[in-house]
């Protein structure tokens, strides 16, 4: 298993603080940009941090839990949206082009035969997971295969920033079950509308999650993150866990998107707590439970925009702020270089 080292470095942290504080501005006046500059500097081990060739991987897979009527959309939307990604017509395509972010699309386990397709990375573990209301979503072997596939994909990314996106009808239910199993919070605090369920649908979804977590109580009680992942997760979530671990091992900046991506991070952080040093929480989703997830992980979201689309859209929308953070650190004048007087003692 991968070992992720903490970015903590007292000497470099002091150098970064001095560099930031000596820019031509009042102390702390760039707010969260200063926090990001320090974090990225510690990740990259330099006071001259930069963003190089950012990339985002969208992982798609289907979920057996849809048999419990937990989504407002049919399962076929998963493969139809993959086709939309490949055609360049989804929101993530638009935002990735706008922000010069390389986009990779992965079939992690969609219930559809795509054949050989340009632009689609075939890592299909199976044609969707099993129904975790009745049995574990995947076998331990399938879970390990998916995690390893994610690691291998992240190993091949060229840049130093990696974001994660997902597509899978039913995956907010899987993420909510992971959240409840990991935090022991009531299902009502973990379950939201997903793709747009009405109030009665949300109540039904809460019961499905509550009952499923209770059904697998013996597994949940062990608090073993990979067992929880195999029991409730999707193949896309498992691949994201692996990709996160490998990206952090490579000292990349990890852009964390919404509810499903953060559920994967909960698993990864239980395996390797230092991974959180590498994570930028791009936004706080409107999906119920995401704020609690972020708080549980000690994170602070960059954006608050009411997003709940997924696909990695929030991560790519936060990219300009990462550029701004490293650019002011490298390019902004100091009081000395600009011959500007500092504040009175």
UniProtKB/Swiss-Prot annotation:
Reported EC number(s) for this entry are 2.4.2.21
> Coiled-coil intervals in this record?
none
| Pfam families on file | DBI_PRT
GO molecular function ontology, one term from the record: nicotinate-nucleotide-dimethylbenzimidazole phosphoribosyltransferase activity
Keywords on record: Cobalamin biosynthesis, Glycosyltransferase, Transferase
Which InterPro entries does UniProt cross-reference here?
Nict_dMeBzImd_PRibTrfase, Nict_dMeBzImd_PRibTrfase_bact, Nict_dMeBzImd_PRibTrfase_N, Nict_dMeBzImd_PRibTrfase_sf
Membrane as UniProt keyword: no
Q: Mind telling me which Gene3D superfamilies this protein's record contains? A: 1.10.1610.10, 3.40.50.10210
Its pathway, per UniProt, is: Nucleoside biosynthesis; alpha-ribazole biosynthesis; alpha-ribazole from 5,6-dimethylbenzimidazole: step 1/2
Any Gene Ontology biological process: cobalamin biosynthetic process
This enzyme catalyses:
5,6-dimethylbenzimidazole + nicotinate beta-D-ribonucleotide = alpha-ribazole 5'-phosphate + nicotinate + H(+)
Q: Which residues of this protein are catalytic? A: 311 (proton acceptor)
Q: What does this protein do?
A: Catalyzes the synthesis of alpha-ribazole-5'-phosphate from nicotinate mononucleotide (NAMN) and 5,6-dimethylbenzimidazole (DMB).
Q: Which family does it belong to?
A: Belongs to the CobT family.
Q: Which NCBIfam families match?
A: cobT_DBIPRT (TIGR03160), PRK00105.1 (NF000996)
**Official protein name in the record:** Nicotinate-nucleotide--dimethylbenzimidazole phosphoribosyltransferase
Organism of origin is Janthinobacterium sp. (strain Marseille)
Question: Gene of origin?
Answer: cobT
């Amino acid at each position: 298993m991968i070992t992720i080292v903490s970015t903590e470095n007292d000497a470099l942290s002091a150098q970064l603080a001095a560099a930031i504080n000596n820019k031509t501005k009042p102390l702390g006046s760039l707010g969260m940009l200063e926090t990001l500059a320090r974090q990225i500097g510690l990740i990259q081990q330099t006071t001259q941090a930069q963003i190089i060739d950012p990339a985002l991987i969208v992982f798609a897979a289907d979920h057996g839990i849809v048999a419990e009527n937990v989504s407002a959309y049919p399962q076929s939307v998963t493969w139809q949206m993959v086709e939309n990604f490949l055609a360049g017509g989804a929101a993530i395509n638009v935002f990735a082009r706008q922000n010069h972010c390389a986009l990779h699309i992965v079939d992690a386990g969609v219930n559809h035969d795509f054949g050989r397709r340009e632009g689609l990375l075939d890592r299909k573990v199976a044609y969707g997971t099993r129904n975790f209301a009745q049995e574990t979503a995947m076998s331990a072997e399938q879970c390990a295969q998916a995690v390893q596939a994610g690691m291998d994909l992240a190993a091949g990314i060229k840049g130093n920033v990696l974001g994660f996106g997902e597509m899978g009808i039913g995956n907010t239910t899987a993420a909510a079950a992971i959240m409840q199993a990991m935090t022991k919070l009531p299902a009502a605090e973990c379950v939201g509308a997903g793709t747009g369920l009405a109030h009665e649908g949300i109540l039904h979804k809460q019961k499905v999650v509550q009952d499923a977590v209770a059904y697998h109580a013996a597994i949940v009680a062990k608090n073993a993150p990979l067992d929880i992942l195999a029991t409730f997760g999707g193949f896309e979530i498992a691949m994201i866990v692996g990709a996160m671990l490998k990206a952090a091992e490579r000292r990349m900046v990890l852009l964390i998107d919404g509810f499903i991506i953060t559920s994967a991070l909960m698993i990864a952080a239980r395996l390797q707590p230092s991974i959180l040093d590498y994570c930028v929480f791009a936004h706080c989703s409107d999906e119920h439970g995401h704020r609690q997830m972020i708080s549980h992980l000690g994170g602070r979201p960059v954006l608050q925009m009411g997003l709940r689309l997924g696909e990695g859209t929030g991560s790519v929308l936060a990219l300009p702020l990462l550029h701004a953070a490293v650019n002011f650190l490298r390019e902004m004048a100091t009081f000395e270089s600009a011959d500007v007087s500092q504040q009175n003692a």
